[in-house]
């Protein structure tokens, strides 16, 4: 357990090596450094996990490193904490990170910026691991900023393309809004409680009457909520996530599965003792999550880009995690987070393979019939999509999402339940729409196939993820009992749960059959609807992310551009030139006094002497 700091150090050292020797290392050595460092971190994580489980689920390990800040009464330690939540997230991040790295060695092998890609990916994982292991908010903030920086670097990886640069800047600025509110929350927490340590804060909230300062708790909870929804791409700060698809597909898989997007969920789960005392903020969180679920599902229904569909699906599934958090079902949220990380990685890697094999074709309407050409990719995409759509009995997503929805029923959150079930149907429709258009029907591809050679790098990650996306993962129990007081919901033995699961199964299958009918059997019906004015308006409205991009352009971008255009000529110079003009005016008029005539000088002396005598007489009196 004392070696857990190596989980951060290994990818960090590999990042430094790859960055400093970017022009000197051969591709084979770059691949070994990048992958082996993450593999070592994963092995150490598994060793720590087994050690943690052997000590009992109630154990919490503290790894002291050094005193970071010590100024008078301000003392911040740079220490690590390993409890059930952090070890769960750590295992997920390093394991999925290793599989993505392994797949990336095949995916990006023909590109020139091989070294730069692996250096960014390793820094990304190091930052996320630091965020997860931090025992206080300030150390966590370093990792929080680190994943934001790495997301910017990876989204803008193809910097020669102007759209990639714009997408990277957009994502960085929007998530920066959340970063500002997070640092404000950190300041307020330290000012009122004198500590940023998670353990000490939890003890304060459990042993003292902090409810008296009700407004303060709501303000801090609101600031943390804004930070979380910005990082996890929830309404209304969700627009950056779709543009983030400009980066390489393995980077998108890492962002969406186990790092950037999940950081907001982890933040709220880690600060659960604070949010438990802010029911108003939790209800707002529930409303935001439901809106995100519905809006993302409807937007995914009209997308053509396969990566954009997966991006909207991430928004929706993270919405379910936030819905669980809003109902104080912390364990269910983390369970769905881990489940989603697995099948979403599977979907992104499969989509990446399809894209690279079709010469970078991303439009699903230009694909079709790929199941015959690539049965392995079809099977992996089918399993991942089925888990995303909560296909009954066989998939892990059916149980993790079903538990969240049943919790809404048990706790009388009927609005959340109805919207969550509607989102489940819509998820099934757009997921199988994507599968049917890409892998079924007639072959519509225009590009020539690239030869798909099965290697360990592009096959093993898919096989492992396929296995974990099934019901097998349900047998794995996450060690969260020491973190959350409510870890075993009573409805697990409720007889009504069987009926509820049957209902969810019917809805999932209904969505699949609707998708089959609309996009394989009777495509003319969809075309007929889109040809109407109303249908075309709705299509464009959903396609443009419900007008959020246009709204932000009007409210933020256009005023900024207007001010920048005005400041281009520096209007301050107008005011600064006034003293200069006055000095020139005075100088111009004073020069007429010095004209060289003696009579003028004598008159000036006499006049000055006369004024001096008058002043002296006045002062004497």
Curated annotation (Swiss-Prot):
Transmembrane segment boundaries: 2-22, 33-53, 59-79, 80-100, 123-143, 169-189, 210-230, 249-269, 274-294, 306-326, 338-358, 374-394, 412-432, 460-480, 500-520, 537-557, 597-617
UniProt keyword Cell membrane present: yes
Enzyme superclass (EC): translocase
Family according to the record: Belongs to the complex I subunit 5 family.
Organism for this UniProt entry: Buchnera aphidicola subsp. Baizongia pistaciae (strain Bp)
Annotated keywords: Cell membrane, Membrane, NAD, Quinone, Translocase, Transmembrane, Transmembrane helix
Record localization: Cell membrane
Protein name: NADH-quinone oxidoreductase subunit L
GO cellular component, one term: plasma membrane
Highest classification ranks of the organism: Bacteria, Pseudomonadati, Pseudomonadota, Gammaproteobacteria, Enterobacterales
Membrane topology: Multi-pass membrane protein
Main location per the UniProt record: membrane
GO MF annotation, one: NADH dehydrogenase (ubiquinone) activity
């Amino acid at each position: 357990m004392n070696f857990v700091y190596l989980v951060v150090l290994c990818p960090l050292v590999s990042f430094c090596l790859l960055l400093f020797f970017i022009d000197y290392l051969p591709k084979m050595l770059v691949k070994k450094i990048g992958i082996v460092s993450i593999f070592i971190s994963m092995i150490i994580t598994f060793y720590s996990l087994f050690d943690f489980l052997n000590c009992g689920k109630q154990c919490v390990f503290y790894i002291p490193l050094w005193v970071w800040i010590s100024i008078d009464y301000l003392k911040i330690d740079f220490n690590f904490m390993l409890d059930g939540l952090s070890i769960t997230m750590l295992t997920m991040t390093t394991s999925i990170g290793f599989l993505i790295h392994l797949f990336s060695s095949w995916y990006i092998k023909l590109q020139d910026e091989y070294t730069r890609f692996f250096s960014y990916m390793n820094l990304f994982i190091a930052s996320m691991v630091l965020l997860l292991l931090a025992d206080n908010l300030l150390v966590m903030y370093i990792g929080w900023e680190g994943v934001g920086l790495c997301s910017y670097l990876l989204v803008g990886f193809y910097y020669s393309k102007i759209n990639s640069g714009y997408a990277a800047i957009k994502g960085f600025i929007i998530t920066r809004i959340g970063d500002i509110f997070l640092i404000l929350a950190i300041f307020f927490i330290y000012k009122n409680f004198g500590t940023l340590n998670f353990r000490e804060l939890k003890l304060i909230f459990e042993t003292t009457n902090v409810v008296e300062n009700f407004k303060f708790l709501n303000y801090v909870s609101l600031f943390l909520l804004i930070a979380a929804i910005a990082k996890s791409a929830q309404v209304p700060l969700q627009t950056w996530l779709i543009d983030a698809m400009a980066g390489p597909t393995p980077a998108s898989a890492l962002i969406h599965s186990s790092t950037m997007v999940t950081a907001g969920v982890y933040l709220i789960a880690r600060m659960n003792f604070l949010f438990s005392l802010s029911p108003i903020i939790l209800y707002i969180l529930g409303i935001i999550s439901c809106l995100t679920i519905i809006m993302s599902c409807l937007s995914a229904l009209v997308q053509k880009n396969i990566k954009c569909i997966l991006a909207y699906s991430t928004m929706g599934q993270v919405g379910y995690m936030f819905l669980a958090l809003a109902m104080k079902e912390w364990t269910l949220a983390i369970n769905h987070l881990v489940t989603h990380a697995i099948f979403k990685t599977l979907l992104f890697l499969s989509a990446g393979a399809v894209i690279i094999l079709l010469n970078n074709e991303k439009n699903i309407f230009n694909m079709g019939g790929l199941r015959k050409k690539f049965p392995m990719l079809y099977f992996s995409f089918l399993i991942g999509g089925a888990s995303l759509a909560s296909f009954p009995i066989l998939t892990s997503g059916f149980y993790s999402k079903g538990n969240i929805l049943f919790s809404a029923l048990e706790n009388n959150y009927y609005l959340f339940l109805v919207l969550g079930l509607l989102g489940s149907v819509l998820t099934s429709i757009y997921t199988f729409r994507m599968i049917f258009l890409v892998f079924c029907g007639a072959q519509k591809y225009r590009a020539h196939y690239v030869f798909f050679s099965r290697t360990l790098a592009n096959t093993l990650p898919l096989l492992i993820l396929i296995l974990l996306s099934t019901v097998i993962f349900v047998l794995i129990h996450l060690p969260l009992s020491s973190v959350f007081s409510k870890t075993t919901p009573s409805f697990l033995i409720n007889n009504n749960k069987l009926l509820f699961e049957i209902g969810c199964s019917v809805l999932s299958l209904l969505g699949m059959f609707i998708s089959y009918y609309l996009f394989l059997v009777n495509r003319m019906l969809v075309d007929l609807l889109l040809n109407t004015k109303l249908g075309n308006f709705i299509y464009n409205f959903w396609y443009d992310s419900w007008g959020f991009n246009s709204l932000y352009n009007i409210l933020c971008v256009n005023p900024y551009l207007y001010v920048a255009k005005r400041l281009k000529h520096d209007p301050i110079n107008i005011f600064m030139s006034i003293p200069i003009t006055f000095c020139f005016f005075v100088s111009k008029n004073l020069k007429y006094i010095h004209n060289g005539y003696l009579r003028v000088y004598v008159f000036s002396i006499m006049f000055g002497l006369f004024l001096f005598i008058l002043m002296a007489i006045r002062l004497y009196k």
